[in-house]
Amino acid sequence: MKILVLNCGSSSIKYKLFDMTTKEVLAQGGIEKIGLVGSFLKLTLPNGEKKILEKDIPEHTAGIEFILNTLVSPEYGAIKSLDEINAVGHRMVHGGERFSESVLLNKEVLDAFIACNDLAPLHNPANLKGVNAVSAILPNVPQVGVFDTAFHQTMPDYAYMYAIPYELYEKYGVRRYGFHGTSHRYVSQRVCEFLGVDPKGKKIITCHIGNGGSISAIKDGKCIDTSMGLTPLEGLVMGTRSGDIDAGAVTFIMEKEGLNATGVSNLLNKKSGVLGVSGVSSDMRELEAAVAAGNPKAILAEKMYFYRIKKYIGAYAAALGGVDIILFTGGVGENQANCRSEVCEGLEFMGVKIDLEKNKVRGEEAIISADDSKVTVAVIPTDEELMIASDTLAILNK
């Protein structure tokens, strides 16, 4: 059983082809700069070698056609024929309240997904382009949608509602939805497998820390709260996003700077966060170098970044009524030891104790808490694509 997983962005398509009998990745890569000058496909060969194939890719259908042709090409192919692809699983960003689990895509489902476009005007239409492209090229292959927001649909209303006039929720669906749900679901399940424990009765805080970041509180395997909101702008300090900010500060800045809604959205989403404070970069590796060189704004940005994560862990420990497992994932969470140690420093009162030697781990599954730590602290690399492929397989087998 071979499943192709697609993640279509506004100008990019990432893909992974899995053989689900072994969960082996047969092929992976991505197209960048769709519709722009200099578009290309970057792929990883089975031996780990990377190749870049340049080609003019005006839109998503041409991109997916290029990917499929590459998958069966004599030189870079992983399969002999496209008939070997049994199904396609799509990362779908915003499923609103309509989707609390992964679904087989049909006209009714896609119409409901299109109705959520207002909530993710950049991402949802791009996801849809991917689905339509596959329908055009492989009309008989079943497609499954896996929603970033679905895992968080178990939050209680008092956690997801905003304290604004209730009719704004009724009219426009303004509430907390949360994102990175497929990642939070994967790592929270995987850490229980890794530790050999039952998710039932466990209180887990999952920290997905990358250029974008979010934290979730998970009780008995279900999400009860998460840091991102109606959009991915709420919560943690991120690479270019502000995270939590007083709404009054937003209107104040709009007046002072003469910004409209688009302008202030651009400021908070693309020019803020670590980049905005440090003036150096949104990349934590570059920020680290600036911190090491003694750059005061970089030092401030890093402290703010770590502090916000720590604050959310404390809040979610309260929401859960304690915590059994704290888990780090995402590009920064998996690879940056100082992020994990700084965040956990001062949490000893909660029973958190890091083993500095164990914490040197990068990008692999590990327990990094000390043997006498009451709370287990773990690193679990996320695998959203495998989760999407697994869901797709489960739906096919229904």
From Swiss-Prot:
Pfam families: Acetate_kinase (PF00871). ATP binds at residues 14, 208-212, 283-285, 331-335. It catalyses: acetate + ATP = acetyl phosphate + ADP. One of its GO terms (cellular component) is cytoplasm. GO terms for molecular function: acetate kinase activity; ATP binding; magnesium ion binding. The keyword Iron does not apply. Gene3D superfamilies: 3.30.420.40. Belongs to the acetokinase family. This is Acetate kinase.
